[in-house]
Each structure stands twice: as structure tokens, then as C-alpha cells.
Design a protein with these regions (language model features):
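Short, small-hydrophobic-rich alpha-helical interface motif
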Residues: 43-44, 48
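Conserved beta-strand-loop-beta-strand hairpin that lines the nucleotide-binding pocket
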Residues: 1-4, 49-125
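STAS-typified acidic loop motif
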Residues: 3-18
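A short, structure-level motif marking secondary-structure boundaries and short turns
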Residues: 5-7, 29-31, 81
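Conserved short strand/loop->alpha-helix "switch" segment adjacent to the catalytic nucleotide/phosphoryl-transfer site
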Residues: 15-42, 90
Length: 125
């Protein structure tokens, strides 16, 4: 199963992206992973808002009980990596640490048009 949505790259679209994930997974019968998937999309979508360019595409695919979620934007930033823990007082900088803990696998890359792709993969129990 596949689903795709497109959003302007603005903070007010984050709630629509979360609702899309929630509704899509519920319709696919994947209720056990909705909370994790919504949090993962929140982190990736927020990174696209802060560091990307152009519209944001949200793609979801469920194959053999494995959910892949991808957030794509027109930003041409360098590949991302985990940085050090920002510390207890920091108000930012934890997004990829959260992604790393919740996702079984995750990564990023650029397509032939230079668009940035961030993806996560989780199993649906």
C-alpha cells in the first residue's frame, strides 16, 4: 500500500501531515505504530521546514508489515548525521536522536534533481 501527500513548507502544515499519517495508518490497520510514525514524521517534517526548500512531499509505503516513511524537499543540504546529545537544557537538536531511537533504519540522500530525501523504516507488529 502507498500514500502520498504534498504540503507547502510552512510550520502550519505540520498538523496536516500528522493527521495524514494517523488517518492513513488507521485505514491500513496499522494502529500499533501510529504514535511512533506521527512522532517520526513530526521530526522529519520539522527538519524540512527548518533546513529545506520548496514544497514538502510525504510518502508512506507498507510492504510485508514494514512501514517506510519518506519526507522530500527541494533543499540541497549536505547529508545529515547524528551529532552529540545537546544536553538537558537545550531546546533544539534532538530530532535525529529521536529518529535514531524509534526507527529500525533511517537515512537520507539526494535524487537526480537535487531534492533531499529523509526516510525511516519501522516494522508493523
Amino acid at each position: 500500500m502507498r500514500a502520498t501527500a504534498h504540503y507547502p513548507r510552512t510550520a502550519d502544515q505540520l498538523s496536516a501531515a500528522r493527521a495524514f499519517v494517523r488517518d492513513t495508518l488507521a485505514s491500513w490497520g496499522c494502529r500499533e505504530r501510529i504514535d511512533d510514525a506521527v512522532l517520526l514524521v513530526s521530526e522529519l517534517f520539522t527538519n524540512a521546514i527548518l533546513h529545506g526548500a520548496g514544497r514538502v512531499d510525504l510518502r508512506m509505503e507498507l510492504v510485508d508489515a514494514r512501514l517506510t516513511v519518506e519526507v522530500v524537499d527541494a533543499g540541497r543540504g549536505p547529508p545529515v548525521s547524528l551529532g552529540p546529545d545537546p544536553g538537558i537544557e537545550a531546546t533544539t537538536g534532538r530530532g535525529l536522536l529521536i529518529v535514531d531511537k524509534l526507527a529500525e533504519r533511517w537515512g537520507d540522500g539526494h535524487d537526480q534533481h537535487g531534492r533531499t530525501h529523509m526516510w525511516v523504516e519501522v516494522a508493523n507488529p
